[in-house]
């Protein structure tokens, strides 16, 4: 960490969090993980290793459905790991899918593959004894899970725009470059998981494994990056610490990016020092300075981000402490150039184009709706087998979207009928409402240790109830962006939904309304600590008014604000917790 101290960063006078000690003592993230792998007395990791495995893309979890039962039997919780792959832009080849499918079936407790809204896949329920084989498998097919969790730059998102294929490819290449550029330089991941060799700390190692961008204590907190291609904001570009909005020149070629910082959706119930936030614009950079801008933002966060209080350690709090102008000036100093004025752009939609679309290169792309991103086999819907069968014949690639769906991309005209037949056979093509198409949930119970309420397991029935409400008021063909998360950690971006549910306790949620369709506005708390049925009743009343009082093409989230049902969140750090403090201004 830098020795720099500037006005407004009072945290620098306070003790560092223990995570900073942990990273310093970790021998560049190796810890004693190899020793723990040999310990068969527990299914989990001890001491610092419990946290260190996160830097390698894993979390220790257990099955909370049977936790009490095992406690009665005097057994430790049934521990296992979540593995999150690094997959910039969400592109994966069919041969890679075949291998990850095989591992999921043979070695995970839940025999499923979970698509995430960060455009990658997760395994749930991997036993400790299968971790090294899993990482070696990923390595053998050109994948890894480096830096998909913990205090690093996580999986980089990129708009899944199959129509503008050339522009998408250009932006995707930059998403990959950004991901690679911001990776840790340490060989700790390979030493532990692939080579399985113990490396002792030494002065020579310190010289070899210098971390010129991240530093030896890495970043103060998680760091998320996205690349968006207007007019589609499928990646929720305002929700990330660092964001790049692709700008085209007069010939339709990528010429640079608008750079935004300070987005993030996590907060803590009742803690008014925490808040969700939409990102602020720093300005425009031409293509040749893109990596310098990314590095400059990361270095600024590295040096000035809060390392004392992890609840205030994300980039948005650093921007608040330094001021936006102060943050911009430090980034410009790091990259040795000035930002140009922000270039004009417009986002008009956020969801995926479900079904077939044709690209400008005449290839076809089939977007499959995957509810909550869960790919598994059920008697009525053998989705996992269906995707496997597609992988066996598909000649293009798969793209995981930021809405947890799957695109069968680059299908030739002559292969289209075969792809569609397989997808229909296994229930991968289905008739769904617009409401369901635009709904998301986090995993939550039974595996997430932070979950306060259900999410994925209640979403299907909850959306069915809301579908009835929309039909009742003759707006069944309309879309309301609805998201459920089991806690306020923000994993499924409920704080950018028109209707956002945030878990408060088992069976109870806080209801937020008033986000917009473009993903520019934070929804405000409307009702606190109520049941799902009470939420349905509240939405019934709101939709009744929306259906009869709205203006032409007025979205639900815009209506509840125009009608003064709820006040907008204008400056989240000022008015998220108290609408009486609103100071009218622009959001970005």
Swiss-Prot record:
One of its GO terms (biological process) is sulfate assimilation. The keyword Oxidoreductase applies. It is an enzyme of class 1 (oxidoreductase). One of its GO terms (molecular function) is metal ion binding. Its EC number is 1.8.1.2. Pfam families: NIR_SIR, NIR_SIR_ferr. Its cofactor is siroheme; [4Fe-4S] cluster. It catalyses: hydrogen sulfide + 3 NADP(+) + 3 H2O = sulfite + 3 NADPH + 4 H(+). Component of the sulfite reductase complex that catalyzes the 6-electron reduction of sulfite to sulfide. This is one of several activities required for the biosynthesis of L-cysteine from sulfate. Alpha(8)-beta(8). The alpha component is a flavoprotein, the beta component is a hemoprotein. This is Sulfite reductase [NADPH] hemoprotein beta-component. It comes from Actinobacillus pleuropneumoniae serotype 3 (strain JL03). The lineage of its organism: Bacteria, Pseudomonadati, Pseudomonadota, Gammaproteobacteria, Pasteurellales. The gene is cysI.
